[in-house]
Amino acid sequence: TASSAVRRLAGGAIMGSSTAWFLTENPDFNGSVLVIERDPTYECAATTLSNSCIRQQFSTALNVRVSQFGADFVKNLRTYLGGDERVPALGIRNFGYLYLADSDAFAQTLRDNQRVQLAAGAATELLTPDQIKARYPYYNVDDLILGSINTRDEGYFDGSTMFEWWRRQARERGVEYVTGEVVALTSNPAGTRVESVTLASGEVIACGQLVNAAGTRGAQVAAMAGIALPIEPRKRY
């Protein structure tokens, strides 16, 4: 069968559901949204397995500001979601990430990055080995030159709850979720736009636009459109 809508999202975990939510939140958007998710239990999704960590120690101002918006969204989730009293209050468990330099080159990178971060409004501190030892006496700092840490809006949060409420509100606003695995994409003759997706069931779904929100499988979906996307799943320890 074939059907038509404005937006199709391949992947329904936190990236797909947040995209669907933000589309429906935009007053200029009057289309329809369909989310295609291969596993509606999300048992093995990166969203489910993630520690939901957030940081601001980046080398570009844009990344810092994106993270700051994310932190504000977490801390004011109920407000962003329209004051819905069902939405719980969330916060960030601040502990900060400590980056350690054992070479002059990496120490200079930390200094350069701190300038970018401070200019963007982050609270990054640079620590000498003695300062690191004073804060963390159990560390051996003999081979260290410099440390970098930010303990404001840097730590972890309850990402599962945020995901659940993005998804719940998206569905309440008319976003449709279907179970299926995208196995092929069909592009227009010029190869500039995806016109339809084919599911493992054989169903063909027409697209106005397709959003690749497949997470660690994003490279596989992109390859169906002839795009080499440098995404690969890696286990974090």
Where are these regions (language model features)?
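Gly/Ala-rich phosphate-binding loop of Rossmann-like dinucleotide-binding domains
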Residues: 20, 24-25, 169
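Dinucleotide-binding Rossmann-like beta1-alpha1 core, especially the glycine-rich loop
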Residues: 51-135
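Conserved Rossmann-like nucleotide-cofactor binding loop
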Residues: 15, 19, 41, 217
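Helical element adjacent to the flavin cofactor pocket in flavoenzyme catalytic cores
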Residues: 149-209, 213, 217-220
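Glycine-rich FAD pyrophosphate-binding loop
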Residues: 24-47
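Glycine-rich beta-alpha-beta "Rossmann" dinucleotide-binding loop(s) and their flanking helix/strand
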Residues: 220-237
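A short, glycine/Asx- and small/polar-enriched loop/turn
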Residues: 105, 136-145, 187-196
